[in-house]
């Protein structure tokens, strides 16, 4: 089972259906409706942290969950706010983007590794965010896995765990 943390965003249900289409059993839990021990006791194959409004510091258990996934070596994918929560949990800074992107399509350039394996190096994706991971504060345990043509971080990957984040959706 995959546990999908809902940060009160309707895109959570798109992720739910995408994962289901891939044959995964998915349980959706709101970011303020469970504690970490309850989630770990469910013995999931992995977690997905959804997009949502606001900043990682106000995303319920999302940041704490990132640290638990690192400690327990549980796979994790963070999308948008979930991506930011990964960097924030490791003491990275989340800042206002130079330009706000809500429903804008941009070219994404990947490293073709991890979740980007078997995908084109470059592809178009839609962006819905006004916050980004600050490059200068990127924690040492994370590497950049994707960027825009302008260099904005669009993907991060933990160097020692199966933990990835994508800013776009």
Predicted features by range, described:
Residues 34-43:
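Short amphipathic alpha-helix with an adjacent loop that forms part of the alpha/beta core around
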Residues 25-31:
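Short hydrophobic/Thr-rich beta-strand motif most characteristic of the beta2 strand and flanking loop
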Residues 166-168:
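Phosphate-binding/catalytic loops
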Residues 12:
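Active-site-adjacent helical/loop segments in soluble small-molecule enzymes
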Residues 42-118, 122-124:
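Cysteine-nucleophile active-site neighborhood
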Residues 1-3:
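Extreme N-terminal starter segment of soluble prokaryotic enzymes
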């Amino acid at each position: 089972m995959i546990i999908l943390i809902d940060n009160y965003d309707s895109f959570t249900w798109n992720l739910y259906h995408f994962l289901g289409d891939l044959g995964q059993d998915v349980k959706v839990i709101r970011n303020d409706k469970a504690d970490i021990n309850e989630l770990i006791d469910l013995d999931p194959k992995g977690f997905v942290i959804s997009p949502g409004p606001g900043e990682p510091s106000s995303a319920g258990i999302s940041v704490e969950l990132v640290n638990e996934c690192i400690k327990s070596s549980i796979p994790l994918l963070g999308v948008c706010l979930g991506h930011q929560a990964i960097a924030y949990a490791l003491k990275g800074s989340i800042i206002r983007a130079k330009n706000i992107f809500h429903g804008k399509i941009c070219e994404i350039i990947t490293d073709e590794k991890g979740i980007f394996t078997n995908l084109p190096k470059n592809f178009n994706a839609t962006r819905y965010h006004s916050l980004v991971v600050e490059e200068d504060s990127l924690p040492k345990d994370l590497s950049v896995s994707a960027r825009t043509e302008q260099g904005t971080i669009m993907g991060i990957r933990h160097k020692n765990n199966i933990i990835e984040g994508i800013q776009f959706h």
